[in-house]
Amino acid sequence: MTISYCSQVKNRLYQFKQTVGLNLEHIAKNKNTEWVIVDCGSTDGLYNYMKKLGAMDRVHYYKTLNYNTYSIPVAKNFAIRLSSGDYVFNLDIDNYIGNATYHIRRLGPETGVCCNVFKKGVYGRIGCSREIFNTIGGYDESFLPAGKHDTDFINRCKLINYKFMHIPCKTSPILNSKKETIKNLDTNIDWETMNKLNGMKMEKNIKKNIFCPNKKFTKCKFEYNFKKNTELAGRI
């Protein structure tokens, strides 16, 4: 079973520098893993930083070319859709892989994993089989750019009887404020309002047993590993 660790980022180089070393070491030591990093238009030097790191086995860096409205659910879908693993794991850029690979292999694809210690910033560590991701259509791209998207993802998986197991986070993540979370989003709506409105939509979909709310995905073109371009279509 191949595991894809999937990250999206915009202007978080200061945090990425703190987590990248251990995460790259993990990928290098664990065969049948890969790390997909999607840069959603960073202007803080991430592109040049990645270029200086050079080519790395099973590490895939994509930079968006025509994506101008940054939304976390859409960006998370980009990273997973560009990955190739049988098992996909959303890894926020301020988090460490830690011992996730061990637990995923122990539990197998029939069980999802999550680390639900919200206040410590590790709620975004969510994994499931690719089959399940495809069945529920990924993260809900109609959501406002932040708030409740991880909870919604897990709840929709549960609608089709896919179970999740809590796994501990071996290494503490880089702590964030809500201000940091939303500062690069293309919206004037505060986090609390987005969280509330997305929560209302989540409850409505669950009540109606809608486990796959996306009718189509967001299209996008990317530069891949500084060499060639690729494209994601909008089909589910």
Regions found by a protein language model. Give the residues of each.
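Cell-envelope/extracellular polymer assembly enzymes that use nucleotide-activated donors
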Residues: 2-4, 34, 152
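Short, well-formed alpha-helical segments that are part of the catalytic scaffolds
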Residues: 12-27
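Short beta-strand/loop segment that forms part of the nucleotide-sugar
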Residues: 31-41, 62-65
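A conserved acidic beta->alpha catalytic loop
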Residues: 39-49, 92-96
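Glycine-rich, basic loop-to-helix element that forms the pyrophosphate-binding segment
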Residues: 66-83
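Short aromatic/hydrophobic "clamp" motif used to bind/position activated sugar donors
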Residues: 88
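Conserved donor-nucleotide/metal-binding helix-loop-beta segment in metal-dependent transferases, i.e.
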Residues: 100-118
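C-terminal catalytic/acceptor-binding lobe
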Residues: 151-236
